[in-house]
Amino acid sequence: MLADYAFIGVFFIGAVIFPLVPLVAAYFLGPKRPTPIKLDTYECGLEAVGDIRVQFKIQYYLYALAFVIFDIEVVFLYPWAVAYGQIGLFALIAMAIFLVILVGGLVYEWKKGALEWV
């Protein structure tokens, strides 16, 4: 029984090791002498002009979060739409519940004024 799921453990270990190897190699093999130029702020290859720290309005964050939520919705809808003929009525009901929950969240955001641009 445990051997059937061994590939998940191997996949997890590989998923941890794969990004760590280049990071550890860069740490040990890379130069350790930061110069003032390396510590300077980089802005598209040009000298930084004005204040480097710019505060963004929270509305950008809310719009980005709403975009990600509804983008993930499309990721879930696409495979369902492709396999709809094979999975039947239960999948239709499950997806309808999923969409009702997401639309309910959108209506809640709208009523709270999160989508109003100020």
Curated annotation (Swiss-Prot):
- Job of this protein: NDH-1 shuttles electrons from NADH, via FMN and iron-sulfur (Fe-S) centers, to quinones in the respiratory chain. The immediate electron acceptor for the enzyme in this species is believed to be ubiquinone. Couples the redox reaction to proton translocation (for every two electrons transferred, four hydrogen ions are translocated across the cytoplasmic membrane), and thus conserves the redox energy in a proton gradient.
EC number of this enzyme: 7.1.1.-
Entry's transmembrane regions = 6-26, 62-82, 87-107
Q: Which GO terms describe its molecular function?
A: NADH dehydrogenase (ubiquinone) activity; NADH:ubiquinone reductase (non-electrogenic) activity; quinone binding
Can you tell me which family this protein belongs to?
Belongs to the complex I subunit 3 family.
The enzyme's main class, written as a single word, is translocase
Quaternary structure, per UniProt, is: NDH-1 is composed of 14 different subunits. Subunits NuoA, H, J, K, L, M, N constitute the membrane sector of the complex.
Q: Which reaction does it catalyse?
A: a quinone + NADH + 5 H(+)(in) = a quinol + NAD(+) + 4 H(+)(out)
- Recorded protein name is NADH-quinone oxidoreductase subunit A
Q: How does it sit in the membrane?
A: Multi-pass membrane protein
Key words of the record: Cell membrane, Membrane, NAD, Quinone, Translocase, Transmembrane, Transmembrane helix, Transport, Ubiquinone
Q: Tell me which stretches of the chain form a coiled coil.
A: none
Compartment(s) of residence: Cell membrane
Q: Which GO terms describe its cellular component?
A: NADH dehydrogenase complex; plasma membrane
